[in-house]
């Protein structure tokens, strides 16, 4: 794998709330990561302006708002995300088949024959969760089995891929095929701590398992030199 290919796999989690920080990180890292993730805190604080600033700095965007509501509401919200020109956006697989399918039909209808729509991802089981977490909400399945079940449901609904722990990537590949996108948080390079993630893997391990994109935040943001940290992660991926 080339360095350019490795860079494209990294999604920097822009976990900030100040608009000035958006421009800072976008300008600093736009040549060193493939995409920027805008989550709930930043989007609530700054709205679409955060997305536009990243785009102005030449960056691509994963709008990570994890929609989960009645089908029409999620479909319309996802359409608005798509109209912002983001590359990735997501919803919860636990919202069910109808919610996911309605969303994909709405996007395909509105983007038919024109600009390519963003890829839509379904959240499976959050990387901060484990089997005890699932039991607490009445789910008795082991985490890997639940992840695969949700991934297969998402694929059947027309969703482009999933967000899942790197530990489940190989299982998802077996169940859903090589063209189904897999985005993995819970990735920690050799120089970083696990923080609040429970199901983690190194960048090289996650890519080897078949991950298309790696979501990485604190190991880069908290480093003395964020650019050097990003470059080290690229080194790890290339070295395999």
From Swiss-Prot:
It catalyses: orotidine 5'-phosphate + H(+) = UMP + CO2. Its EC number is 4.1.1.23. The keyword NAD does not apply. Pathway: Pyrimidine metabolism; UMP biosynthesis via de novo pathway; UMP from orotate: step 2/2. Homodimer. InterPro entries: Aldolase_TIM, OMPdecase, OMPdecase_AS, OMPdecase_bac, OMPdeCOase_dom, RibuloseP-bd_barrel. PANTHER family: OROTIDINE 5'-PHOSPHATE DECARBOXYLASE. GO terms for cellular component: cytosol. GO terms for molecular function: orotidine-5'-phosphate decarboxylase activity. SUPFAM superfamilies: Ribulose-phoshate binding barrel (SSF51366). HAMAP family: OMPdecase_type1_B. Belongs to the OMP decarboxylase family. Type 1 subfamily. The gene is pyrF. Keywords: Decarboxylase, Lyase, Pyrimidine biosynthesis. This is Orotidine 5'-phosphate decarboxylase. Pfam families: OMPdecase. Catalyzes the decarboxylation of orotidine 5'-monophosphate (OMP) to uridine 5'-monophosphate (UMP). Substrate binds at residues 15, 37, 64-73, 127, 188, 197, 217-218. The active site is at 66 (proton donor). One of its GO terms (biological process) is 'de novo' UMP biosynthetic process. The keyword Nucleus does not apply. PROSITE patterns: OMPDECASE. It comes from Citrifermentans bemidjiense (strain ATCC BAA-1014 / DSM 16622 / JCM 12645 / Bem).
């Amino acid at each position: 794998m080339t360095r350019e290919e490795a860079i494209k796999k990294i999604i920097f989690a822009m976990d900030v709330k100040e608009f000035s920080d958006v421009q800072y990180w976008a300008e600093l890292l736009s040549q060193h990561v493939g995409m920027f993730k805008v989550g709930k805190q930043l989007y609530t604080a700054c709205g679409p302006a955060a997305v536009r600033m990243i785009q102005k700095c030449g960056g691509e965007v994963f709008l990570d708002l994890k929609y989960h509501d009645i089908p029409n509401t999620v479909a319309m919200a996802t359409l608005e995300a798509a109209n912002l020109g983001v590359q990735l956006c997501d919803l919860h697989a636990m919202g069910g088949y109808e919610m996911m399918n309605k969303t994909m039909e709405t996007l395909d209808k509105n983007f038919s024959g024109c600009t390519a729509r963003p890829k839509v991802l379904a959240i499976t089981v959050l990387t901060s969760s484990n089997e005890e977490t699932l039991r607490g909400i009445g789910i008795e399945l082991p985490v890997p089995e639940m992840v695969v079940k949700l991934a297969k449901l998402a694929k059947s609904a027309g969703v482009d891929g999933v967000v899942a722990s790197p530990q489940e990537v190989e299982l998802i590949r077996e169940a859903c095929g090589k063209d189904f996108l897999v985005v993995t948080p819970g990735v920690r390079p050799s120089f970083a701590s696990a923080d609040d993630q429970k199901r983690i893997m190194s960048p090289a391990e996650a890519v080897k398992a078949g991950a298309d994109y790696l979501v990485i935040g604190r190991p880069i943001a908290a480093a003395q030199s964020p650019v050097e940290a990003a470059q080290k992660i690229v080194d790890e991926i290339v070295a395999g």
